[in-house]
Amino acid sequence: MARYRRHSRSRSRSRYRRRRRRRSRHHNRRTYRRSRRHSRRRRGRRRGYSRRRYSRRGRRRY
């Protein structure tokens, strides 16, 4: 039983970590600052963000 418990715990933890990491990418100021130069061009094409929506935000910010 102890073994099973340990396993399940690690499994759930990894899942949580994955989810959190994905979110931190957008809301992390350090990474945002670093990739500010390339983020504008790359993000729109690569991830498929709508250009209208992104340009509105980007223009105001940058």
From Swiss-Prot:
One of its GO terms (cellular component) is nucleus. It comes from the Eukaryota. PROSITE patterns: PROTAMINE_P1. Keywords: Chromosome, Developmental protein, Differentiation, DNA condensation, DNA-binding, Nucleosome core, Nucleus, Spermatogenesis. GO terms for biological process: chromosome condensation; sperm DNA condensation. One of its GO terms (molecular function) is DNA binding. It is found in: Nucleus; Chromosome. Residues 1-62 are annotated as: Disordered. Testis. Protamines substitute for histones in the chromatin of sperm during the haploid phase of spermatogenesis. They compact sperm DNA into a highly condensed, stable and inactive complex. Belongs to the protamine P1 family. This is Sperm protamine P1. It comes from Antechinomys laniger (Eastern jerboa marsupial).
